[in-house]
Design a protein with these regions (language model features):
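Auxiliary tRNA-acceptor-end handling modules of aminoacyl-tRNA synthetases
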Residues: 2-8
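Positively charged, Gly/Ser-enriched RNA/tRNA-binding surfaces
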Residues: 9-25, 36-39, 60-61, 71-84, ...
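Short acidic/polar active-site loop segments enriched in Thr and Asp
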Residues: 28, 151
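Polyanion/phosphate-binding surface patch
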Residues: 30-64, 107
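Acidic, His- and aromatic-enriched active-site or binding-groove loops in soluble protein domains
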Residues: 51-59, 169-203, 297-300
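Extended hydrophobic secondary-structure segments that form protein cores and membrane-embedded regions
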Residues: 93, 153-154
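Short, highly charged C-terminal tails/helix-capping segments
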Residues: 154-164
């Protein structure tokens, strides 16, 4: 992507507005090299993301790679500078990332991420605060019209899906990962194609075969009911999910987390229009273990998640 002066100015104005919000909430900046040791980036990403990493070799023959996000470099920073960093560490990082992905609408091989994280905070209050900061950042860049938000934050919890799969006998790691990747395609390919991929697989529009997970029909139906839950409010969604999950300690813990998060978002003044609970959001990255959220622009699906 090339940016001419008018686009550069507009883009910088957006980044500056986001940065001001981050700093107002007490987040401090860091920066890391675009190039990382290959093993640093591949250790936490998972096989699907590993396929999207731009790799190269240093003049000394050492494998290196271009960062595909800003979270893995942040994990390295926290580990490497543990004696110098005081926890909880509230950092923001704005910079380009690179993915050897197939370009398409809303998908680029280089794009800018505006990351915030709170390292060393175990409370769900930290997740709720990050969501609140993201809402304010989106408002600051003008994604609202007559008080109506033009963005939506979709929120789920990996523990919910883990409880669903574990309660239905799906415990083998690679099979769970495959299932999560298929579920995460829901908005892109629709429920019928998702159900086919959870079963014996399907043929895509280009005629290429897509392998299936080969789950039993009863499990596919349970997953379809689970990801189809959509309550009128965050708390109502949690209530409906209770009827779609097997009874277990892990289910109780996951639902308790979602109830607490719903209450925190209400207390922070986050409207139901700005943030919804969506159990179909799973993401494919292996390092997600609890709450998961992403932002989308309302009415513009071609942009993808932001």
């Amino acid at each position: 992507q090339d940016y001419l002066p008018e686009d550069v100015i507009a883009r910088q104005n957006v980044i500056d507005a986001i940065r001001r919000v981050y700093e107002r909430y007490g987040f401090v900046p860091i920066d890391t090299p675009v190039l990382e040791h290959f093993e640093t980036l591949t250790g936490a990403a998972g096989n699907e993301v590993n396929k999207e990493i731009f790799t190269l070799e240093t003049p000394e023959g050492e494998p290196a790679a271009m960062r595909f996000d800003l979270t893995v470099p942040f994990a390295r920073i926290v580990s490497q500078y543990r004696e110098e960093i005081k926890l909880p560490f509230r950092r923001y990082h704005i910079g380009p990332v690179f993915r050897a992905d197939k370009p398409g609408p809303g998908r680029f091989r280089q794009f800018t991420q505006c990351d915030i994280d709170i390292a060393g905070a175990r409370s769900l209050a930290a997740d709720a605060e990050v969501i609140a900061v993201l809402c304010e950042a989106m408002r600051a860049v003008g994604t609202a019209e007559d008080g109506v938000p033009l963005f939506r934050i979709r929120i789920s919890n990996r523990l919910l899906v883990d409880a669903l799969l574990g309660g239905n006998g799906i415990t083998e790691t690679e099979r769970m990962k495959h299932t999560l990747r298929v579920i995460d395609k829901l908005q892109k390919v629709g429920i019928d194609n998702v159900k086919q991929e959870l079963g014996n697989g399907r043929i895509d529009d280009s005629g290429d075969p897509i392998p299936g997970v080969y789950l039993p029909e009863t499990v596919i139906s349970a997953i379809a009911e689970f990801i189809g839950v959509c309550g009128a409010s965050r708390m109502e969604t949690v209530t409906q999910l209770q009827t779609k999950l097997p009874v277990s300690d892990s289910t109780a813990a996951a639902l308790s987390d979602m109830q607490e998060l719903a209450a925190l978002l209400d207390a922070l003044g986050i409207s139901e229009a700005e943030a919804i609970f969506d159990p179909s959001l799973t993401r494919g990255l292996d390092y997600y273990t609890g709450p998961v959220f992403e932002i989308e622009v309302v009415g513009m699906p071609s942009i993808g998640s932001i």
